[in-house]
Amino acid sequence: VLKTPPTLAAELSGKTGVSISAPYANENSRILLSTTDISSENGKIKIQSYGDQYYYARQSELYTFERRSYKTGKWYNRKHITEVKEHKNAKPDAVNLSASQGIDIKSGGSIDAYATAFDAPKGSINIEAGRKLTLYAVEELNYDKLDSQKRRRFLGISYSKAHDTTTQVMKTALPSRVVAESA
């Protein structure tokens, strides 16, 4: 069984507000947030940059592999069974912005948000981009596979073989989400 350890998201919080800025007029004046939770209990979130802003969702993945062989029946009428189970789950860990009084985002360049949640239950959300604003959905994958091989023997002579494979793949996408009391 192989499992990748979970990585914790960066967390920024402020009771009366959170402000992040990159105001200088040069090409490196960008803001990049990846798998980050930013919250303000009683205030606003303000993010400003002269250049581009990127809100990336990291893909966390869980993979398991199990192989099991066993025998059933009496010595003269044996059934040998081999099962291989495989499971893969990949889901995005997004940027979450949550402020009770509102969210203000301004960029002189582009804003690219991958599966980002903008949440301002008692306020408004203002997003301004100088060039372009793009909200992306990020793919989520759930994959299960069962491979089963059965052999039957009677007095040591093989007389039946069966091989079954069952595969289930479910792909969904986590979109960017904007929730506010007023827009």
Task: Set out the residue ranges of the language-model regions.
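Binding/recognition "hotspot" determinant
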Residues: 1-183
